[in-house]
């Protein structure tokens, strides 16, 4: 397939600051006022490009918490993103969604090209701020054919009631949320129940994430890709050839 542009940024009125007071004094003042008003809105949110036609392949959204404390985890994750499309070449399209700096700043077009996905991941940097998983879930809900959202994160700092509503809607649509939960920081463990609550509502699950074990992460992502294409049936058929399949199936069984 032909790749679309990397990502498109759109205004997010809810998170944009109020416009600066009008100034007088000529062209320079008017220019400063315009920049103050428009730049925060332009860079506040991201969504994938508008779609033409109906997707022909299953889709997966690879979502990552790239706040400042997450740099070690993101460094590990960006090295193995290609596993998502290499597991079943040509059978799954993947989009990269990233939040950092208290906003979703990246939501790429869907692609099944491993090099394209790796290049897009390489360009992401971590920024300090609160988590923004829910806007990623909301945007994913509007996309067609998304079978799985796999999210790497440690804490949840948003509205749980809103998260539950989104998770219920994703579940009705047939989109599973799979969370790779990083508990390297002991304070993150308190959010395990929250992530399980959201994931189970979609029919998904939560697995532990270890930034120091990139090989295991690659195995898990490969298994998630197979699950996105063929569900539990295909995952069970390939469990002997996929090192991550057994772990994923074990955690999927825990949701029941």
PLM regions with names:
Residues 90-93, 144-148, 173-178:
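Loop/turn elements at helix/coil->beta-strand transitions in domains of secreted/extracellular proteins
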Residues 96, 177, 203-208:
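Conserved beta-strand scaffold positions in the cores of enzyme catalytic domains, especially
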Residues 137, 146-153, 192, 196, ...:
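Extended, alpha-helix-rich binding/interface surfaces that flank or overlap catalytic cores
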Residues 155-201:
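VWA/integrin I-like adhesion module and closely mimicked acidic/polar interface patches used
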Residues 206-256:
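C-terminal "exit" segments of structured domains
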Residues 2-61, 68-75, 90:
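Acidic, polar low-complexity linker/tail segments
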Residues 55-152, 156-161, 184-191:
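Von Willebrand factor
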């Amino acid at each position: 397939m032909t790749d679309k542009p990397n990502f498109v940024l759109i205004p997010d009125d809810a998170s944009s600051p109020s416009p600066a007071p009008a100034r007088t004094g000529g062209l320079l003042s008017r220019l400063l006022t315009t920049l103050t008003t428009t730049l925060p809105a332009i860079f506040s949110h991201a969504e994938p490009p508008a779609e033409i036609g109906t997707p022909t392949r299953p889709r997966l959204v690879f979502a990552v918490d790239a706040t400042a404390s997450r740099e070690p985890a993101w460094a590990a994750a960006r090295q193995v993103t290609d596993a998502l499309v290499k597991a079943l070449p040509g059978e799954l399209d993947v989009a990269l969604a990233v939040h950092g700096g208290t906003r979703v700043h990246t939501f790429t077009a869907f692609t099944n090209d491993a090099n394209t996905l790796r290049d897009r991941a390489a360009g992401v940097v971590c920024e300090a701020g609160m988590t923004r998983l829910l806007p990623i879930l909301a945007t994913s809900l509007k996309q067609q054919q998304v079978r799985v959202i796999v999210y790497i994160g440690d804490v949840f700092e948003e509205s749980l009631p809103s998260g539950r509503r989104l998770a219920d809607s994703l579940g009705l649509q047939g989109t599973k949320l799979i969370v790779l939960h990083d508990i390297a920081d002991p304070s993150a463990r308190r959010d395990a129940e929250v992530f399980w609550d959201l994931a189970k509502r979609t029919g998904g699950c939560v697995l532990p994430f270890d930034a120091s074990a990139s090989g295991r992460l690659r195995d898990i992502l490969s298994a998630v890709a197979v699950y996105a294409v063929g569900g539990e049936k295909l995952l069970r058929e390939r469990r002997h050839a996929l090192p991550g399949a057994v772990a994923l199936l074990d955690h999927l069984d825990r949701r029941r």
